[in-house]
Amino acid sequence: MKVAVNTFLLFLCSTSSIYAAFALNSDGAALLSLTRHWTSIPSDITQSWNASDSTPCSWLGVECDRRQFVDTLNLSSYGISGEFGPEISHLKHLKKVVLSGNGFFGSIPSQLGNCSLLEHIDLSSNSFTGNIPDTLGALQNLRNLSLFFNSLIGPFPESLLSIPHLETVYFTGNGLNGSIPSNIGNMSELTTLWLDDNQFSGPVPSSLGNITTLQELYLNDNNLVGTLPVTLNNLENLVYLDVRNNSLVGAIPLDFVSCKQIDTISLSNNQFTGGLPPGLGNCTSLREFGAFSCALSGPIPSCFGQLTKLDTLYLAGNHFSGRIPPELGKCKSMIDLQLQQNQLEGEIPGELGMLSQLQYLHLYTNNLSGEVPLSIWKIQSLQSLQLYQNNLSGELPVDMTELKQLVSLALYENHFTGVIPQDLGANSSLEVLDLTRNMFTGHIPPNLCSQKKLKRLLLGYNYLEGSVPSDLGGCSTLERLILEENNLRGGLPDFVEKQNLLFFDLSGNNFTGPIPPSLGNLKNVTAIYLSSNQLSGSIPPELGSLVKLEHLNLSHNILKGILPSELSNCHKLSELDASHNLLNGSIPSTLGSLTELTKLSLGENSFSGGIPTSLFQSNKLLNLQLGGNLLAGDIPPVGALQALRSLNLSSNKLNGQLPIDLGKLKMLEELDVSHNNLSGTLRVLSTIQSLTFINISHNLFSGPVPPSLTKFLNSSPTSFSGNSDLCINCPADGLACPESSILRPCNMQSNTGKGGLSTLGIAMIVLGALLFIICLFLFSAFLFLHCKKSVQEIAISAQEGDGSLLNKVLEATENLNDKYVIGKGAHGTIYKATLSPDKVYAVKKLVFTGIKNGSVSMVREIETIGKVRHRNLIKLEEFWLRKEYGLILYTYMENGSLHDILHETNPPKPLDWSTRHNIAVGTAHGLAYLHFDCDPAIVHRDIKPMNILLDSDLEPHISDFGIAKLLDQSATSIPSNTVQGTIGYMAPENAFTTVKSRESDVYSYGVVLLELITRKKALDPSFNGETDIVGWVRSVWTQTGEIQKIVDPSLLDELIDSSVMEQVTEALSLALRCAEKEVDKRPTMRDVVKQLTRWSIRSYSSSVRNKSK
């Protein structure tokens, strides 16, 4: 093509001097000049556009008037690319230009405005950029302007408003922005206005109501705000109205008194409130009505029954209540009826069975009850029936097997009983069948894949029995097979080659026999779950050929033999669980090559030999379970396992000392090395501050228990038993020695008998040692107090040299200029300091002028923050103390605060449940660290989303804890001078008191957790000042028990996943326990961490499984 272009242009150059000789008129010359801007010209044009012609009137795409002047240029979809040249202005008689469906780029030439006779412009479906030229306003004869599907930007040109007879404007699919002109109503002859899929903002202009000729109004997929203008009721000729996917609010103001012409109304994905206008029944031509994902409420109007032409009704994702109106059965043209995710109750009206053309019936996630009317099962046109997450009951009728068009049937999480009709699938092209979490009995129908269309079969959590139909193993279209938690028995099916199965879960049944080697044919499978069965024999090495496998769970069976080394070929494997079997031999060292592995569980088998060093090299491993085997030798170095959270090596034959680099595992929460032959001291554990569970019992450890571990002596004292030489290191005065029924104090000596010291001698030695220690302590304290100030001043002044970091920070912020302010709080102003692209800091300035003891308070904050280190707490980088103020330097968090993410981004930033759960877990870890792992403990005093900062990975970091009071070691709460905290987050006991406690922080955390779940503020405007988020959630939860009425609507789709539903429900319950009025009913933050992480471990496999359904 490039050769053709060059040849054509060369031809033009060589013939430029002969235009006159052959008398090619000026229009022809102008057209040839346009081609010089094209980079790709089709051969049809190069052959047709001949410079030797006298006129271009016979050229391809060109039409002329009677005087041989070009009046039409139509090159639509010819495959031309290049720029649209300014020479177009030479075509003075041009009335119509159509260049749609090509590859034009660059700007639309402003010279197009010189073609004063133009009536029709179509430049759609190209790649034009830049603004729409204002010069187009000079085209007073223009009637049609089509610029859709380009990359145009900038505002709507107001010059177009002066074109008197403009009828159609198509600007769809660009990047136009700014407000729609308020006087757009001046375009009085407009019939079509397409402004959808742009970035327009501001309100919908009320002047649109002046354009009574308007038939099509598309404003969808913009950033429009405010209410719909009531003036739209004036548009009696309107046929299409689409304002979906904006941020419009308020009641729907349309009375629909004069709506005889309207065909389609789409209001979806806005924030409309109130009910639907009853006047909708007047719109007798209405074919489609959509208002899903708004905040509409009240009953569904029965007037829809008057709309006999209505074929599509979308009301999903609102707050509609009451019963489904039986009048809907009169909508004889209905094809698609979607009322899901509301609060509808009662039975499904049998009148819906009269909708003989219905193809899609979606009523899921409501409160519907009773049996599904038999008439529904007789709608022969039905393709998709989605009734899941209701309270429906009864049995499935045999009639359903005659639904020949049925493609998808989802009834999960109801109370259906009886046998699944055995002919289901034999007469239809069924692709999806989901009956999970019901009470079905009997056998799996044998013909579900007889039409070779089945893609997803989900029958988990029922009471099905018998074997898996053999044809499922040969169902090449099957992608998801989930039969978990039934009473199925027999052997596993054999799988043929060229299978498309992606997800395979038969766990929790009674399957027996070997794992078939044919599982190796599932080349696309990503997850295999066969746990909790009675499978026997060896693990087939053919599983090693599953290169896409990510999850393999064979636990709780009676498998024996070795663990095949071929599994190391599954390079994407992230979970391998073969625990609770009879496996033996050594653990393959090749498993260390699985770089994506996050969980390895081989516990409760008979593995022997040493632990392969290669297993301890994975920096992604979170959970390593090797307990209950016959492993021997030393524990290999573990320092590379930086992400490890749980390590279980218990009940083996390990010896030697704990690895010295065990203390480097800063994320470790659970450690169990009990019932081994390990020796040495526990000194390496003293630096692991993240531990929430430890068991080192029944070993040969000696020496003192590190102070950081003594907290476990009360919660789990037996975790230290069976170590006869282990002791507690008591203070010299002996008055504060931790009590333990398991361990003795380290300074307690048994009577040595003859030749030993007398009791008096021992007492004198102890007394002398105590006096010496006291004197040494007093002398050290004197030196410390005497030197503290000078040392501090030296440290501070040393930071203020010309090349110091302080100097650079002040320079970057122009001496703390207000334009760098990114936040202000009760304790200071925060600035953003950018030293370089990879060195961005937050600088907090605390002013002391007029504040008594300000510098002392500053030192307290600095000392507190400076010694606290945790991945979920903001880290102090530097500090400087000056006469009038102090500066603290932190790492800048680019995602701002949790408050910003939840409430200030527009449009709201998408946050799935996994992200919210991680934020909740991280925040809990940080707060638990402050409460239990700092010595003395720290009460934050103002936990709220604004004090939870999020890094680039949305990992939470608690800030502003440096001003917290330091708890006395022997107290649980401390009186402060003033009531501190934020309204809405303060615990009830703190509203009129100055006492702050760890329990107060727990209450505040509960409020934050509710905000994560609901995406509502603690004092949300929707509460109308009558309550706070705790009261609102408790009221709705008590009255309805429906999580869907509480959670952020954007999470509703995820709640389809039963494991997510379970986690969100339990998180809500935990949040309410944290926010109990009575202090002693609240859990500790350590309890909160345990529960949140327990969900993560317990739901790890099931959540992965359900997300893949």
Swiss-Prot record:
Glycans are attached at residues 50, 74, 114, 144, 177, 186, 210, 245, 282, 367, 391, 427, 510, 524, 553, 584, 648, 677, 695. GO terms for biological process: defense response; protein phosphorylation; response to other organism. Pfam families: LRR_1 (PF00560), LRR_14 (PF23598), LRR_8 (PF13855), LRRNT_2 (PF08263), Pkinase (PF00069). Residues 1-20 form the signal peptide. It catalyses: L-seryl-[protein] + ATP = O-phospho-L-seryl-[protein] + ADP + H(+); L-threonyl-[protein] + ATP = O-phospho-L-threonyl-[protein] + ADP + H(+). Possible role in short-day photoperiod floral induction. GO terms for cellular component: extracellular region; plasma membrane. One of its GO terms (molecular function) is transmembrane receptor protein kinase activity. The keyword Nucleotide-binding applies. LRR repeats lie at residues 69-92, 93-115, 117-140, 141-162, 165-187, 189-209, 213-236, 237-258, 261-284, 309-331, 333-355, 357-378, 381-404, 405-427, 429-451, 453-476, 477-499, 500-523, 524-546, 548-569, 572-595, 596-618, 620-642, 643-666, 667-689, 690-710, 827-850, 958-981. The active site is at residue 942. ATP binds at residues 822-830, 845. Residues 816-1096 form the Protein kinase domain. Its EC number is 2.7.11.1. It comes from the Eukaryota. Keywords: ATP-binding, Cell membrane, Glycoprotein, Kinase, Leucine-rich repeat, Membrane, Nucleotide-binding, Repeat, Secreted, Serine/threonine-protein kinase, Signal, Transferase, Transmembrane, Transmembrane helix. InterPro entries: Kinase-like_dom_sf, Leu-rich_rpt, Leu-rich_rpt_typical-subtyp, LRR_dom_sf, LRR_N_plant-typ, LRR_R13L4/SHOC2-like, Prot_kinase_dom, Protein_kinase_ATP_BS. Belongs to the protein kinase superfamily. Ser/Thr protein kinase family. Residues 21-764 are extracellular. The chain crosses the membrane at residues 765-785. This is Receptor-like protein kinase. The keyword Plastid does not apply. It is an enzyme of class 2 (transferase). Coiled coil: none annotated. SMART domains: LRR_TYP (SM00369), S_TKc (SM00220). INRPK1 and INRPK1b are expressed in leaves, cotyledons, shoot tips and roots from induced and vegetative plants. The highest concentrations of INRPK1 are found in vegetative roots, and the lowest concentrations in vegetative cotyledons. INRPK1b is more abundant in roots than other tissues. INRPK1a is expressed in vegetative roots. INRPK1c is expressed in cotyledons.
